[in-house]
């Protein structure tokens, strides 16, 4: 039976990053993933799943050797961010305020994943098993891993990077705290009449926010949060009818659009009660999911990866060191989850006094330079 130092279950963005990081440290690593990412071509349609990548995440991707490959495919830098409910009460962020060329990048998830996968061949100590998936884990001095193909292998530690419905988390007997936001989120890729933009914006509404994320060329990703019933209704429309509905309910800043593709998913919050148990380590969505309000999901996952790699650099893996990783990350992730929930609950109602207060707060926030800069630095991973 093949034996490894670490088995990573899940080869998405976070799983690929942690596998690369451990391979870079010289450990014997196996990565198990069900689907190999498609080869990139410029003619491919944009992935409907995109992420707002922070400076901290770019640093991690550069350290892993993947960022240059990602940039050579397609990324869209953004330099400005605006958020508002009433048009006259806006909070604006600009990269110039921090002396940066851009606040971050909007990048398709599959492009990030593919950029990481392109680095695998550099590490003979990294084995990729794909397509295959986890069937069971048995715990002893090591972990025996059985795959759905019937293959078995052994690892000292298992990293769960297999998403919100993590099998690793279940096999490791790690509980979760979870609730449903009773909202769904629709992602809509559109063609715009404007040239490539450098701004991302979000308008709050009692029924849920509406967001704009620029993509390369004359394209953009729109995010529409609403009740499950409303999102189901939108999902049944033709592209032409949906475009009319979007232009009617989104801010005038959007302009004329053509719908290219769309999809939707329910909003839920999950947080693992432990990040480490039974020789299993959780990272990314396996450990925590967050309201996508600020696009911080994958950035939190990359922060997990950086913290895990840092605490284990040059060390034999031990439960004590892994508890340090858990302490370092669980509180930060909980803080971000709670912050997003606060914004969600504050803006998802139509109570008149609260509406007045929150709009005044947004207008005031735009004037408080030092505080605004600190909030922005935290979101960008600069502190």
Spans of features found by a protein language model:
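Conserved N-terminal helical subregion
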Residues: 2, 59-63, 73-171, 179-184
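FAD/FMN-dependent oxidoreductases across multiple families
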Residues: 230-319
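N-terminal glycine-rich dinucleotide-binding loop that anchors FAD/FMN and/or NAD(P) in oxidoreductases
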Residues: 46-71
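C-terminal helical "tail/cap" subdomain of flavin- and related membrane-associated enzymes
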Residues: 310-383
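Conserved Rossmann-like nucleotide-cofactor binding loop
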Residues: 14, 37, 165
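Glycine-rich FAD pyrophosphate-binding loop
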Residues: 23-46
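Conserved FAD-binding catalytic core of PHBH/FMO-like flavoproteins
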Residues: 61, 158-262
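N-terminal Rossmann-like FAD-binding beta1-loop-alpha1 element of flavoenzymes
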Residues: 5-31
């Amino acid at each position: 039976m093949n034996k490894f130092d670490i088995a990573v279950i899940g080869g998405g963005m976070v799983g690929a990053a942690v596998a690369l990081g451990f391979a870079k440290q010289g450990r014997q690593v196996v990565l198990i993933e069900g689907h190999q990412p498609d080869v990139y071509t410029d003619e491919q349609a944009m992935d409907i799943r995109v992420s707002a990548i922070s400076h901290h995440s770019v640093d991690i991707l550069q350290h892993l050797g993947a960022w240059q490959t990602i940039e050579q495919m397609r990324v869209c830098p953004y330099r400005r961010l605006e958020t508002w409910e009433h048009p006259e009460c806006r909070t604006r962020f600009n990269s110039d305020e921090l002396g940066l060329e851009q606040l971050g990048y909007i990048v398709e998830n599959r492009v990030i994943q593919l950029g990481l996968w392109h680095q695998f061949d550099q590490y003979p100590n990294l084995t990729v098993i794909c397509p295959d998936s986890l069937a069971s884990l048995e715990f002893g001095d090591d972990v025996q891993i059985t795959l759905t193909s019937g293959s078995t292998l052994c690892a000292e530690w298992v990293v769960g990077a297999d998403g919100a419905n993590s099998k690793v988390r279940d096999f490791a007997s790690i509980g979760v705290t979870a609730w449903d936001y009773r909202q769904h989120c629709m992602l809509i890729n559109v063609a715009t009449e404007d040239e490539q933009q450098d701004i991302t914006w979000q308008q709050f509404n009692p029924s849920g926010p509406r967001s704009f994320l620029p993509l390369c060329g004359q394209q953009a990703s729109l995010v529409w949060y609403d009740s499950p019933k409303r999102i189901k209704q939108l999902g049944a429309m033709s592209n032409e009818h949906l475009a009319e509905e979007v232009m009617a309910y989104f801010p005038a800043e959007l302009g004329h659009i053509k719908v290219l593709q769309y999809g939707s998913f329910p909003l839920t919050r999950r947080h693992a009660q432990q990040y480490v148990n039974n020789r299993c380590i959780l990272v990314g969505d396996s450990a925590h999911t967050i309201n996508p309000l600020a696009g911080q999901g994958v950035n939190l996952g990359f922060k997990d990866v950086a913290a895990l790699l840092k605490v284990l650099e040059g060390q034999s893996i031990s439960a004590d060191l892994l508890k340090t990783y858990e302490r370092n990350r669980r509180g930060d992730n909980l803080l971000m989850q709670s912050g997003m929930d606060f914004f969600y609950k504050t803006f998802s109602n139509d109570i008149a006094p609260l509406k007045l207060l929150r709009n005044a707060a947004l207008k005031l926030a735009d004037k408080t330079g030092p505080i605004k800069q600190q909030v922005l630095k935290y979101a960008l991973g600069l502190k």
